[in-house]
From Swiss-Prot:
Top-level taxon of the source organism: Viruses
Keyword terms: ATP-binding, Endonuclease, Hydrolase, Magnesium, Metal-binding, Nuclease, Nucleotide-binding, Viral genome packaging, Viral release from host cell
Note describing how the cofactor binds: Nuclease activity requires 2 Mg(2+) ions per subunit. Also active in the presence of Mn(2+) or Co(2+).
Cysteine disulfide partners in this protein: none
GO biological process: chromosome organization; viral DNA genome packaging
EC numbers for this chain: 3.6.4.-, 3.1.21.-
UniProt: Mg(2+) 2 binding residues: 294, 347
Binding-site list for ATP: 97, 99
Native source species: Thermus virus P23-45 (Thermus thermophilus phage P23-45)
Protein's recorded name: Terminase, large subunit
Subunit structure, as described in the record: Interacts with the terminase small subunit; the active complex is composed of a pentamer of terminase large subunits and a dodecamer of terminase small subunits. Interacts with the portal protein.
UniProt-annotated binding residues for Mg(2+) 1: 294, 429
Xref: HAMAP family: TERL_T4
Length: 485
C-alpha cells in the first residue's frame, strides 16, 4: 500500500503548523518510520495527525495506537478524537461515532452529505486504542496502519509476534515513536532508518546499515524549540545526567542499568560502629537534623538515616531486622532524641496503621511520605541520584551501604515498563532511607526537592483531548472526491 502524504492545505484545515521535524515525518513515504525525539517535542501530536489523515483520506482504513498501557494510549487517542470531530465539520459527507470507554472511533463515509436525501454509507474507517501489556489481545486483526507510542518500553516480542503480522495483508505502515531507553530493539530499528550520518548521542550512527523500508528522525527537545534552549539547560541542574540525556537529549545511552551513575562523586565518611548504629558524628546543638525512616517488613531491614541539614552528611545510620513494630519505633524515638529530637520523614505505606499509631503514641515528630507508587519512588530516587552526581551526598564508608547503592538498578518488566529495584534478592532499605532523608535537604546551590503530584490514571474527555493539531493530507483533491456530494 502506497503511503499518501498530507498537503499544506490539509494542515491549514486543522490550524496545524508543523515544525521541521514533524514536517519531515509527514513527508516521508517509508513503511516504517522511527522517530526518536526528546520530551515535549511534538512526536505524539504528529502521530495523531497521521491517524486522522488516514481515517479521512482512505475511507475504510483500520488503524491502532498501541502504548505500554491504556492510559498512555488514551493520550494520542484523545487527540485524534478532537481532530476528527473538527474535520467532520468541514466534510459534511462524514459522520463520527465515538465509543470512548472502548477507545474506539469510527468515521463513516457517505456518497453525499449525511443529511442529504438518499445519502448512503460507502465505507467506515476505524481507529482504536490498545495496550501492549496484553499481547494476545493484539492478534488476529488486519490493519492499514499502526502507531507505537513509547515503543522503547514495549518488548520486541510484542512487535514481532503480535503487531507486525497485523500489517502483512494490507502492506500497512507503522509509525514508531519514543524517547530512548538504552540500546534495545527501538535503537536497532532506529539505525535501520538513520541516514543523517555520525551524530553525538547515537552510537554507531556513522555506520551505513539502513533498510529501504525504514526512515528515522532524531532531535533533542532544544533542537525542536531552540528558543527554549536556556530553559532546558536549566533543567540539567535538577535532573540526573542519565535521565536528562535520555528524556530531553534523546540520546541512546549505553549503561550497566545502575541507577546511581554518580557513585564516584559519593563522599565517604569514617564512622564508629555502636551496636546497630554507624556513627559518623554525635549531636551538635547548633545543627538541625532529620531522619529518613524505612520500616522493615518480613525479611526486610529497618533503616533510619540521620541527615545533618547544615552539612548535607549522614551522621548516623541504624539498620536492624527481626524487630517488632514497637521495638522499631522505640529505636527510632531514641535515635531522634539523641539528635535533638530530630524530625522524621517516614514511609508509612504498606505497614498498616500500626506504625502510625505507635509513632503518635510515642510523641515522635514525623511527616508521613508514603511511597505508594513507582512514580513517588522514582522521584525520591532521582533526587538522591542528582545530589550524588553533584557531590552533595555523604555517607558512612561502609561496604553494605555501598553495595546496596551499587546494586540498585533499572529493570524492564514483562509489559515493558521500567522499574527501579535491588539486584536479585538484594535489599533497598538503605537506599530508600537515604532517599527519604535527602528529600528534606536543600542543596548547596539552593535546589530543594518537591514531590510532584501524581497524574490521574484516567483523564476526562475534556482533559485528555488537546486542540493542537498535526495532520497530513496528501492530496486535497482525493479528500474532496471522498467527501463531496
Amino acid at each position: 500500500m502506497k503511503r499518501l502524504r498530507p498537503s499544506d492545505k490539509f494542515f491549514e484545515l486543522l490550524g496545524y503548523k508543523p515544525h521541521h521535524v514533524q514536517l519531515a515525518i509527514h513527508r516521508s513515504t517509508a513503511k516504517r518510520r522511527v522517530a526518536c525525539l526528546g520530551r515535549q517535542s511534538g512526536k505524539s501530536e504528529a502521530a495523531s495527525v497521521e491517524a486522522v489523515f488516514e481515517l479521512f483520506a482512505r475511507p475504510g482504513s483500520q488503524g491502532w495506537i498501541i502504548a505500554p498501557t491504556y492510559d498512555q494510549a488514551e493520550i494520542i487517542f484523545g487527540r485524534v478524537v478532537e481532530k476528527v470531530e473538527r474535520l467532520a465539520e468541514v466534510f459534511p459527507a462524514t459522520e463520527v461515532q465515538l465509543q470512548r470507554r472502548r477507545l474506539r472511533l469510527l468515521v463513516h463515509h457517505y456518497d453525499r452529505p449525511v443529511n442529504a436525501p438518499g445519502a448512503k454509507r460507502v465505507a467506515t474507517s476505524e481507529f482504536r486504542g490498545k495496550s501492549a501489556d496484553r499481547p494476545d489481545n493484539l492478534r488476529g486483526a488486519t490493519l492499514d496502519f499502526v502507531i507505537l507510542d513509547e515503543a522503547a518500553m514495549i518488548p520486541f516480542s510484542v512487535w514481532s509476534e503480535a503487531i507486525e503480522p497485523t500489517l502483512s495483508v494490507r502492506d500497512g505502515w507503522a509509525l514508531i515513536i519514543s524517547t530512548p531507553k538504552g540500546l534495545n530493539w527501538f535503537y536497532e530499528f532506529f539505525l535501520m532508518g538513520w541516514r543523517g550520518g555520525l551524530k553525538e548521542g547515537i552510537p554507531n550512527s556513522g555506520v551505513n546499515q539502513t533498510h529501504p523500508d525504514f526512515e528515522s528522525f532524531h532531535a533533542a527537545s532544544w533542537d525542536v524549540w531552540p528558543e527554549r534552549r536556556e530553559w532546558y539547560m536549566e533543567r540539567r541542574l535538577y535532573i540526573p545526567d542519565l535521565e536528562f540525556r535520555q528524556e530531553y537529549g534523546a540520546e541512546f545511552v549505553s549503561h550497566s542499568n545502575s541507577v546511581f551513575s554518580g557513585l564516584d562523586m559519593l563522599i565517604l565518611l569514617p564512622y564508629e560502629r555502636r551496636g546497630t548504629r554507624l556513627v559518623v558524628e554525635d549531636y551538635r546543638p547548633d545543627h538541625i537534623y532529620c531522619i529518613g525512616a524505612d520500616f522493615g517488613k518480613n525479611q526486610d531491614y529497618s533503616v533510619f538515616s540521620v541527615l545533618d541539614l547544615d552539612t548535607g552528611a549522614i551522621v548516623c545510620l541504624e539498620r536492624m531486622n527481626g524487630a517488632t513494630w514497637s521495638d522499631q519505633v522505640a529505636r527510632l524515638k531514641a535515635l531522634s532524641e539523641d539528635y535533638g529530637h530530630a524530625y522524621v520523614v517516614a514511609d508509612t505505606w504498606g505497614v498498616g496503621d500500626a506504625i502510625a499509631e505507635e509513632l503518635d503514641a510515642q510523641g515522635i515528630n514525623y511527616t508521613p511520605l508514603p511511597v505508594k507508587s513507582s512514580s513517588v519512588k522514582e522521584q525520591l530516587i532521582s533526587n538522591l541520584a542528582l545530589l550524588m552526581e553533584k557531590g552533595q551526598v555523604a555517607v558512612p564508608n561502609d561496604k553494605t551501604i555501598l553495595d546496596e547503592l551499587r546494586n540498585f538498578r533499572y529493570y524492564r518488566t514483562a509489559s515493558g515498563n521500567q522499574v527501579m529495584r535491588a539486584y536479585g534478592r538484594g535489599h533497598d532499605d538503605i537506599v530508600m532511607s537515604l532517599a527519604l532523608a535527602y528529600s528534606q535537604y536543600e542543596g548547596k546551590d539552593g535546589y530543594k526537592f518537591e514531590l510532584a503530584e501524581e497524574r490521574p490514571s484516567k483523564l476526562k474527555h475534556e482533559e485528555s483531548v488537546m486542540s493542537l493539531v498535526e495532520d497530513d493530507f496528501t492530496d486535497l483533491e482525493l479528500a474532496n472526491r471522498a467527501f463531496s456530494a
